Amino acid sequence: MKKVVGLLVILFTAAFLPAVSANQKPAIAILDTAVDTTKVNVAYEVCIMEEKRCPNKQTFQEGPGSATMINPINGFEHGTHMSAIAQKVNPNMDIIFIRIVPATNSGTLGIYTDNTINEAMKWVIANKTKFNIVATSISFGSNRFTKKGHYCPVNQNLRNTIVTLQSMGVASLFAAGNRYDKTRVDYPACISEAVAVGAIGERGNIENYSNTGAELDFYALGTHDVVGRRIIGTSGATAALAAFWAKSYQGAYQPTYDFLKNNSSQLAVNVG
């Protein structure tokens, strides 16, 4: 069972953090709706869906244009917001954007599941070395599960993928959720090997909307002003922490996790 290990209070500008030592810039993979590349810089685009609704009318596409939309509205702008937050926190990294949400014929958000997430994360496994990916940021979650006993409905395939990524040095960060639940985070954030991220406010307060519980790993800033909008929620906190993870990467998963855990209080004090 996990427990909250750190309040990362507005730490994203902490100047004393060690820089990542590598010839190639670190990268994070953002799994989300779609991205507007006129507003954020994306190093590479991928589309992975359960339906044949990628721009090439297939379930898989990669390369320029794979994750973009002509008119990203009706919720599809969410991916642009997450990318902008990550880029603001850490401009010295690459963003690999993986679109996993299809558009219906009417232009609304289509169906995606934890199997979609798993397939996208398997792509990260195959391409981790090529792009130097050190973290994934996933905003999606669900709380449609029983309140009795152990509530986390683990998809073993997804869990195995998270464990494999962890062994390769890649953190799988999931949003805890914005459902005001003070005992449980959303699934898949509740998976023990996932890094569950809750939200704090600009004053360092735990946001009332943020889910919490024994499965939570970190709180991070959940309020960000990007692309002309104020974005609030655990999704933004997750994207921000993924970018900060890349900024403070210690060469492997566990040393980075421990660095953030052991220094979170100090970080909060030093930037206050």
Predicted features along the sequence, with ranges:
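Positively charged n-region of N-terminal signal peptides that target proteins for export
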Residues: M1-V4
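Bacterial N-terminal signal peptides
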Residues: L8-A15
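Sec/Tat signal peptide C-region and signal peptidase I cleavage site
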Residues: L17-S21
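Active-site core segment of subtilase-fold serine proteases
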Residues: N23-F97, P102-T104, Y112, E119, ...
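Extracellular S/T/G-rich loop segment that most often corresponds to the catalytic His/Ser-adjacent loop
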Residues: P26, D32, D186-G251
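Structural recognition of the beta-strand scaffold that forms the well-ordered cores
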Residues: A27-L31, D94-R99, N132-S139, A171-A175, ...
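Substrate-binding/access-modulating region of protease and related hydrolase catalytic domains
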Residues: V101-I191, R203-I206, G228-A240, N263-S265, ...
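Short, charged, surface-exposed loops that flank catalytic or proteolytic processing sites
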Residues: Y249-K261
